[in-house]
């Protein structure tokens, strides 16, 4: 126990979330047309550091995506192949005919994503994808990339 914990007590740990709570309000969304991304199938196993946590990837199982702003993410191969299409220039774009849904929570949670645990703060969107997978998105980012379906 640290001195801070002795004086102030232990900070509560965020709830670990793998499924949506039964009482959440779902909202339907779809991706907006957006800029292309670079993507390639992982050739080895590893971890990618993001602001929300470490995302693991496996050779042949995950795509590594790099957005125009340099932010990187990991997407399971089967999900990537269902939700992205390749452009003639070799880059990829998100399909806009795919529907997702999301909910928000009034408290911080750790979301169990396919790529590893990621932090979601109060008010962040927790999006459910085509395979039932969930991931957190900051509200300002979500407003840029999703629209009501």
Predicted regions and their residues:
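A motif-centric signal for short, conserved binding hotspots located
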Residues: 2-71, 77-131, 140-149
């Amino acid at each position: 126990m640290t001195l801070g914990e002795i004086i102030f007590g232990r900070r509560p740990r965020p709830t670990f979330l793998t499924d949506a709570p039964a009482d959440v309000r779902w909202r339907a969304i779809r991706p907006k047309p957006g800029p292309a991304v670079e993507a390639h199938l992982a050739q080895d196993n590893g971890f990618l550091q993001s602001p929300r946590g470490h995302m693991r990837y496996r050779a042949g199982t995950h795509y590594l995506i790099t957005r125009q702003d340099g932010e990187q993410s990991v997407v399971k191969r089967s999900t990537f192949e269902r939700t992205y299409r390749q452009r003639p220039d070799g880059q990829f774009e998100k399909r806009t005919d795919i529907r997702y849904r999301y909910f928000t929570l009034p408290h911080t949670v750790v979301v169990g994503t396919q790529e590893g645990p990621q932090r979601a703060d109060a008010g962040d969107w927790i999006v459910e994808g085509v395979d039932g997978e969930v991931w957190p998105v900051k509200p300002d980012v979500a407003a840029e990339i999703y629209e009501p379906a």
